[in-house]
Amino acid sequence: MQVMTSRFGTLEINPSDLLHFPQGIPAFEHLKEFFFYPIPENPAFTWLQAAADPEVAFLLVDPFLFFPGYAVDLPARLQEELAIKDPADALVYAVVTIPDGDIRRATANLVGPIIINPTVRLGMQLILEGTKYTTRHQLFKESFSDDESIPSSGGNEG
């Protein structure tokens, strides 16, 4: 199937690659189908593109690469809704915000992780309650000069 996107042009997507978000994503509840659009030069990041709206895409990051102490307990309700048999099999991503397009100031939303069951291709955004996490955790602690690249690394596989 062909999907129009504002960032990546027209993409050919296999319907079996779609991820179904039964409840949508907060503020985008009307959008139920998404797909990953990887960033080959930096596999720590990927895009989560809405299949039905070319303007809606979320930059995701594997939070465990940047925040080694990060922990998410998956509630039984979520495990049931996403048919997760073993929480270790779930993919966990954080939504990234890049203020004014400056990657050096990028932040990750650790209070609202995106949880994916890759086996059955179901996902949802979990809002953590009573946590120390916030919606804006600085990704890069050090400054990068304009000619330095940001290091890439692997993590979640999706």
UniProtKB/Swiss-Prot annotation:
Keyword Isomerase: no
Keyword Phosphoprotein included in the entry's annotation: no
Key words, A-Z: Bacterial flagellum biogenesis, Chaperone, Cytoplasm, Translation regulation
GO biological process: bacterial-type flagellum assembly; regulation of translation
Main location: cytoplasm
Any GO CC annotation of this UniProt entry: cytoplasm
Disulfide bonds: none
Lineage top rank: taxon: Bacteria
A Pfam family: FliW
Location in or out of the cell: Cytoplasm
Any coiled-coil regions, as ranges: none
HAMAP family, alphabetized: FliW (MF_01185)
Subunit annotation: Interacts with translational regulator CsrA and flagellin(s).
Family that this chain belongs to: Belongs to the FliW family.
PANTHER family the record matches: FLAGELLAR ASSEMBLY FACTOR FLIW
Stated role: Acts as an anti-CsrA protein, binds CsrA and prevents it from repressing translation of its target genes, one of which is flagellin. Binds to flagellin and participates in the assembly of the flagellum.
Name of the featured protein: Flagellar assembly factor FliW
Organism for this UniProt entry: Moorella thermoacetica (strain ATCC 39073 / JCM 9320)
Classification of source organism: Bacteria, Bacillati, Bacillota, Clostridia, Moorellales
